[in-house]
């Protein structure tokens, strides 16, 4: 299985690259967010897409580049991490707002719904957070899948399309069960069937 990894110019992309390679058995195809257009991405032979963390805000096109097109138009499963998670909320009409507290390498216990990305992961697992923005009110097509003890949204899922987002960093060495989460994304991709059979 091969993942297209959209790099939003973030140092954590390197960690994602290695962990996805281990989980999938194939190295991801890495493309910077301003390197290729949507029409240039679509011929790539990949099974799913991960949108990396990055600096900036999801409503600023220069910060997320082609990530917004991916979220709007892709029929492949997509996982957004941190900025990618916020971009999923933004593109569907959700609110992205200042966090109650800026998180810079902080560990937080995360609770979740136990399904999808979080299948087989214990409640209260520790995850690393680097963010000053959070997802707020969500549109009807998204639902919350994970949260902190003070109810900050940590995971979202589209109700009808194969789109997921996590605010924390599963690729960090300090995040518990990050490998399991990415394996779950791989398995969710397999459950969708081959690209030609989707839609």
Question: Each predicted region: which residue ranges?
Answer:
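Acyltransferase
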Residues: 173-199
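Acidic di-acidic motifs
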Residues: 8
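Pocket-forming structural segment of enzyme catalytic cores
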Residues: 65-73, 77-81, 86-176, 188
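Residues at alpha-helix caps and immediate loop-helix transition turns in enzyme cores, especially N-
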Residues: 16, 62-63, 140, 177-181
């Amino acid at each position: 299985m091969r993942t297209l990894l959209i790099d939003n110019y973030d140092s954590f992309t390197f960690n994602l690259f290695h962990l996805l390679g281990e989980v999938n058995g194939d190295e991801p195809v890495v493309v910077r967010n301003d390197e290729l257009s949507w029409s240039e991405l679509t011929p790539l032979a990949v099974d799913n897409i991960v949108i990396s963390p990055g600096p900036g805000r999801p409503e600023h096109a220069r910060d997320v580049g082609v990530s917004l097109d991916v979220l709007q138009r892709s029929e492949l499963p997509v996982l957004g991490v941190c900025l990618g998670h916020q971009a999923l909320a933004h593109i569907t009409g959700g609110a992205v707002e200042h966090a109650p507290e800026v998180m810079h390498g902080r560990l937080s216990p995360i609770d979740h719904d136990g399904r999808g990305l979080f299948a087989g992961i214990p409640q209260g697992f520790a995850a690393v957070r680097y963010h000053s923005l959070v997802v707020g009110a969500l549109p009807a097509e998204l639902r919350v899948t994970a949260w902190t003890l003070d109810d900050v949204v940590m995971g979202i899922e589209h109700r009808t399309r194969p789109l997921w987002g996590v605010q924390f960093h599963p690729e960090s060495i300090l995040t518990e069960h990050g490998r399991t989460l990415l394996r779950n994304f791989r398995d969710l991709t397999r459950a969708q069937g081959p690209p030609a059979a989707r839609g």
